[in-house]
Amino acid sequence: MALTDIDVQKQIKHMMAFIEQEANEKAEEIDAKAEEEFNIEKGRLVQTQRLKIMDYFEKKEKQIEQQKKIQLSTMRNQARITVLRARDNLILELLKDAKMRLSRIVSDEEIYQDLLDKLVLQALLRLLEPVMIVRCRPQDLHLVESAVLRAIPQYMRLCQKHLEVQVDQTEHLPSNAAGGVEVYSSDQKIKVSNTLESRLNLAAMQKMPEIRGILFGDNTSRKFFT
């Protein structure tokens, strides 16, 4: 039976409707897949950025913490240095005061003469040279000459050796020095310093742990800011 034009038109419409439905379903499927992929990619990007932000702030937090530690350490060191400097200044002031007190000893000629006798003999016994030169302040020449005269027989008795001692008449210790003597070998290559300043400095060095202990307590510097 032959198809009429109406039947043909109906079949064409039916086929067109089927194709259109198929196309719509395919388009919806593509849209759904695209949206799914978009959401997956968006989630991945969001997670990546989130991790980057977390990593950034974690690093910043560590940097801030490290800076705080450095600043705290610097502050502690500065405070420690300030305390140590103040202690050193106090000790220097005490030594300065002690040196000023030496002038009182020198001003009493009897006491100073007795001290020079001991300083000269001690220096001779330390140097132990056959010929020695004694140098002093210009204002102490007469006292030192007397001290040398008394020291020579004591030296010879103790060492069983003869010696020659010259009091330097041309070169002297500074007149503003605290006092005492320097004793040289004949070629002046060896020297024993027995000035009042050197004796004070030596005593201060030897007694420094005790001085610090009295002033600041035992091992205070070691315990400071620990």
UniProtKB/Swiss-Prot annotation:
Matches recorded under InterPro entries: ATPase_E_C, ATPase_V1_Esu
Molecular function terms from GO: proton-transporting ATPase activity, rotational mechanism
Signal peptide span: none
UniProt keyword annotation of Protein biosynthesis present: no
PANTHER family attached to this UniProt entry: ATPASE H+-TRANSPORTING V1 SUBUNIT E1A-RELATED
GO biological process, one term: proton transmembrane transport
This protein's UniProt keywords: Hydrogen ion transport, Ion transport, Transport
Summary of the function given for this chain in its UniProt record: Subunit of the V1 complex of vacuolar(H+)-ATPase (V-ATPase), a multisubunit enzyme composed of a peripheral complex (V1) that hydrolyzes ATP and a membrane integral complex (V0) that translocates protons. V-ATPase is responsible for acidifying and maintaining the pH of intracellular compartments and in some cell types, is targeted to the plasma membrane, where it is responsible for acidifying the extracellular environment.
Subunit relationships: V-ATPase is a heteromultimeric enzyme made up of two complexes: the ATP-hydrolytic V1 complex and the proton translocation V0 complex. The V1 complex consists of three catalytic AB heterodimers that form a heterohexamer, three peripheral stalks each consisting of EG heterodimers, one central rotor including subunits D and F, and the regulatory subunits C and H. The proton translocation complex V0 consists of the proton transport subunit a, a ring of proteolipid subunits c9c'', rotary subunit d, subunits e and f, and the accessory subunits ATP6AP1/Ac45 and ATP6AP2/PRR.
One of the Pfam families matching this protein, by short name: vATP-synt_E
Domain of life: Eukaryota
Tissue-level expression: Testis specific.
UniProt-recorded name of the protein: V-type proton ATPase subunit E 2
Keyword match Ion transport: yes
Family, per entry: Belongs to the V-ATPase E subunit family.
One GO location term (cellular component): acrosomal vesicle
